[in-house]
Amino acid sequence: MYCSLYEMYEEQESGVAQGAAEIGAAQHGDEIGDFRCFSCVCRNVEHLLEAYPPDKSARKAVMADVARLYAEGGVDMAHADFQRSAYGIVAKHFPRILPFWEHKRAMNDRALEAYSLLKSHRPPSVSAFKYGLRTALAGAGIDFERSSVAEILHGVDSLATAKLAIDHSELLQKKLGEAKVVLYLANRAGEIVFDRFFIKSLSGVEVGYVVNCPYAGYAASGQDADYVDMRSVAKVVANGCEAPSSIPVRLSARAWESFLKADVIVAKGAMNLASFYTLHDPRLFVLMRVPCQAIGSVLGCAAGEYVVVNPEARRQELSRTVTPRNA
């Protein structure tokens, strides 16, 4: 069945609807993002349009509708919801045209070729857990569309022993050691291969891997999960959000149940951070390359830096560095 991005999400399960309402009420003004997010979403939409047939009038109409959406209320929307709506506009103007899989398959193929060489690249001083974690983290910053296999491996090698701007890896390892159920939120195609590499290093835990809608651009979907054999190491769950990231208030019943059961939540990428940041959930760890200063200013680091961050722990760290005005 065609999965229309622009249809409004409707959840029939009363328990999920109630939980979503509670989450919405819990979001009280500390969302990540500002006016700069508009230009970021526009760039993402322009990138999506490159995969579609070269229809100049349709592309102009898409960008006009995105600008109108922002002017008519998008400025007050959460960043993830605005991006979801913008992707929906693309789907509306190009109904039933699904151009992404060939591009994503090529991204996965490059990652898989690099994956076959990863074990021989692991430094002797780096544990299997740390190397798996750093490989997954490197995946968040690699351009799998354009990078060669050599460049991909160089990205992993460079990060294997590098100092991170924020490094809560030890806390993550401790929490994983205590956990029975882990929820892992996917980001993009290609990157999913390195997620699998990290998940394989985890033992004694049940892992749920949450994927995105197959029509949401280059986001990792169930199709990608099947292609890279993710189901052999994790239980794959569709998030139901019709977006390039997971959004708490739009999770499917199954994804919501997985969210509630998880002892630890590992999220990839800035969009998942933005979506879950307002929940103040101590279970959440985010692996990403900081994409912009709007994100960096919240975490207290610069754009372009890599982080393994527990947002709640980071809040506490930053609060301790603030000097009272009257001190």
Features from the language model and the residues they span:
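C-terminal functional extensions of proteins
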Residues: 3, 211, 217, 223-327
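Short amphipathic alpha-helical segments and helix-helix/interface helices
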Residues: 173, 196-200, 255-256
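Histidine-anchored nucleotide/phosphate-binding helix
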Residues: 185, 189-209
